[in-house]
């Protein structure tokens, strides 16, 4: 399963672990994804999405209806 946020598109990033001796090994920085249910009043149903915490803040700010409209316009749901 892809670790991708439905709303923001955040994905894992690649970086390095750096030891005290300055040795570098590859690592992944994973987005903080959560499965959340959102009540959509206009459709009278729950919508379950995998979203990042940044997306939760966006949904709080603009509303779930606006976010779903944007996702539908992009053709993602």
UniProtKB/Swiss-Prot annotation:
Q: Gene Ontology cellular component?
A: cytosolic large ribosomal subunit
Q: Name one Pfam family in it.
A: Ribosomal_L28
The processes (GO biological process) annotated in the record are: translation
SUPFAM superfamilies registered for this protein in UniProt: L28p-like
Gene3D superfamilies in alphabetical order = Ribosomal protein L28/L24
**Which GO molecular function, any one, fits this protein according to its record?**
structural constituent of ribosome
Q: Which UniProt keywords apply?
A: Ribonucleoprotein, Ribosomal protein
Concerning InterPro entries, the annotation shows: Ribosomal_bL28, Ribosomal_bL28/bL31-like_sf, Ribosomal_bL28_bact-type, Ribosomal_bL28_sf
| Family, as annotated | Belongs to the bacterial ribosomal protein bL28 family.
Q: What is this protein called?
A: Large ribosomal subunit protein bL28
Lineage, top ranks:
Bacteria, Pseudomonadati, Pseudomonadota, Betaproteobacteria, Neisseriales
């Amino acid at each position: 399963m892809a670790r991708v946020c439905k709303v923001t598109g955040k994905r894992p990033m690649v970086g390095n672990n750096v030891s005290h001796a300055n040795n570098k090994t590859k690592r992944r920085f994973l987005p903080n994804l959560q499965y959340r249910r959102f009540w959509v009043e206009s459709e009278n149903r729950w919508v379950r999405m995998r979203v990042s915490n940044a997306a939760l803040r966006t949904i709080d700010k603009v509303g779930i209806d606006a976010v779903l409209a944007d996702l539908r316009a992009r053709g993602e749901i």
